[in-house]
């Protein structure tokens, strides 16, 4: 992960157990790769919002597995993609 540190991720997701931490890291890596594949750059200017999106997407997937990404997160993804 380049957009967020493991410590930031664990705190945001309230991941306490080793199992939760491993899941959070795996999801965050997948989410980061998904954002990059959508053409969203990860650089000094986008890192704060990019990292927040990775954390929000990861928390949502941990709390609501299998559910669609909330509209608010999708809107922020589009905003970052087109206004970076």
Locations of regions flagged by a protein language model:
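Divalent metal-cofactor coordination and adjacent catalytic microenvironments
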Residues: 1-84
């Amino acid at each position: 992960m380049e957009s967020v540190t493991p410590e930031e991720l664990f705190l945001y997701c309230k991941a306490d157990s080793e199992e939760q931490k491993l899941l959070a890291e795996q999801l965050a890596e997948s989410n980061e790769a998904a954002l990059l594949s959508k053409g969203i750059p990860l650089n000094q200017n986008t890192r704060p919002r990019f990292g927040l999106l990775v954390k929000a997407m990861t928390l949502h997937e941990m709390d609501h597995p299998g559910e669609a990404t909330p509209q608010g997160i999708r809107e922020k993804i589009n905003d970052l993609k087109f206004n970076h």
